[in-house]
């Protein structure tokens, strides 16, 4: 779809979200939570309203939770990304990593994921799924 322009109304948004949900169900055998992330995290008011009308809720991630694993390692070393994450992540932040990106000359996940988890636990953090996230209140909302 790159380079294409298309306009979706409420029904179109709902169908796109439902299509993704059906695909995840097909792949996993489990019904996914009614959550989505807008492409690039860019959520318009009309998309948010449309999604709510068909039972979906937008979930983004915190700026500190953007772990930078897709950035070039020549400019952003693993040590730099780990330090930035450990300094910036706050309670309730949603973290995101592209664990399948191996284009970095120095791959991120093998070097950073375990020290990040250990470092956050040492700071008193615990880890929850989106279903159990206290600020999202998924159980109450759905």
Which residue stretches match the model-derived regions?
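Metal-dependent polysaccharide deacetylase catalytic core of the NodB/CE4 family, i.e.
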Residues: 1-77, 83-102
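Charged helix-capping and loop-helix junction motifs
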Residues: 76-81, 109-113
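C-terminal domain-boundary segment and adjacent tail
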Residues: 104-142
């Amino acid at each position: 779809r790159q380079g294409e322009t298309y306009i979706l109304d409420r029904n179109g948004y709902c169908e796109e979200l439902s299509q993704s949900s059906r695909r995840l169900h097909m792949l996993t055998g489990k019904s996914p939570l009614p959550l989505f992330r807008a492409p690039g995290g860019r959520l318009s008011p009309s998309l948010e309203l449309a999604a709510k009308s068909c039972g979906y809720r937008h979930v983004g991630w915190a700026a500190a939770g953007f772990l930078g694993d897709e950035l070039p390692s020549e400019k952003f070393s693993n040590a730099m990304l780990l330090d930035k994450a450990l300094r910036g992540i706050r309670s309730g932040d949603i973290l995101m990593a592209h664990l399948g990106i191996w284009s970095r000359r120095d791959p991120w996940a093998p070097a950073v994921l375990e020290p990040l988890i250990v470092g956050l636990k040492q700071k008193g953090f615990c880890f929850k799924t989106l279903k159990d996230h206290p600020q999202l209140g998924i159980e109450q909302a759905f």
